[in-house]
């Protein structure tokens, strides 16, 4: 027994306390299942014992080992860890399992809001993790000259990898430069404009067909963004707007991303579960569907430029065909999730606030009086600089950012200084977007929807550098301008054609209370009426 106890202590201090182990999670899990029976059989054979006698001996030894191991881990995390001085929920200091256990409703962003309200700007949300609601941290963690790197979270889907999830900065920058930058450059965006406008007009037409009857705006904004994504990314529409019903892939996406919302705080749990056939079925179906979209696109001949063409024709990142295939599959999923979920969420929240504050619609219409809404060729340049339109969109993004809980980074080995705080090296840090959007340090009246704060009342934005709904620096969202193009176009066309209001019995509560943080946002229902303008 003393030897088993010593081995448990040695395992922690000599191995588990050092480096990253999330990629070995499945191997460790399998070992924990296979080792006890193997040791039992070996003990029975070598010492000539019955299975029952051997089982008792192994149980005592393994029990002693595990008690020693976990006692050492817990004592270290409580009293000796480099983050021991930072406040936070007690059980969060011990294990990320506790954090996962709080997320049955997939509302991580709201938990973070409560924790920051209780504990302050720096909250320990895991054994080696800090959530930081400090505007001074943003440039140092996400800015172009940051020394922080991507955290272990980005390994969550390996071997599937995308530009977004790649932790190797050199590979990330090469992929962005040779493929993604071209697919989202100024010329490419101009080429996409007619299709963005075309789908916006189809959305207007389909909403008009309701003749003022209630409709689920969350669904229709999803139909629009998914159809645009399909066309611009893979050269084909999914015809959701045309058919007025959801594509099965949206349900797959929500189920697959739902696992992110629940388990992504503990990457090692996610990696174990996604390797269990029954549990991971929906996730694997979605990943397979994403990969198939890219494979089908590779076989197509398209006349109009699309994003996939730049990805397919870019120089390979490896001599291994499997690695290159995983890149395309990962980038395919990135396009589908990033290109549909985020745009749909922003549009839905924009129209929630317009229904709640109808005076904003009148302001938008006045601003749009000098814009020919039917001149599709000049529309984007006309909308781009409209202050109130952009103010409405910015307010929706501030209060309901596309990635509510923020993006994780790892501090450099030497640590990171933020004001009077010296953060230890090689810990996970992040700035929660949802929390920052409601920060009184950054905004006057942070809970109020005031579009003018972005142009005529700049004093209401105390820290403009805290507004990063599309992240910042080298890892900022490459689809930002396309997303804004889509949101501006739909907003302008709909408020020009319709009066917007909550449907009878609707007040927006369901959207606000039931939307889920699944890394991006899975929308709750929002029933609106769009009545033709008189």
Language-model segments: residues:
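Short, small-residue alpha-helix embedded
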Residues: 342-355, 490
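Cytochrome P450 heme-thiolate monooxygenase catalytic core
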Residues: 150-158, 191-346, 363
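Hydrophobic, well-ordered secondary-structure elements that form the walls
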Residues: 364, 396, 426, 449, ...
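Cytochrome P450 heme-binding "Cys pocket" and the immediately downstream C-terminal segment
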Residues: 355-360, 463, 480-518
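C-terminal helix/juxtamembrane-tail motif
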Residues: 518-534
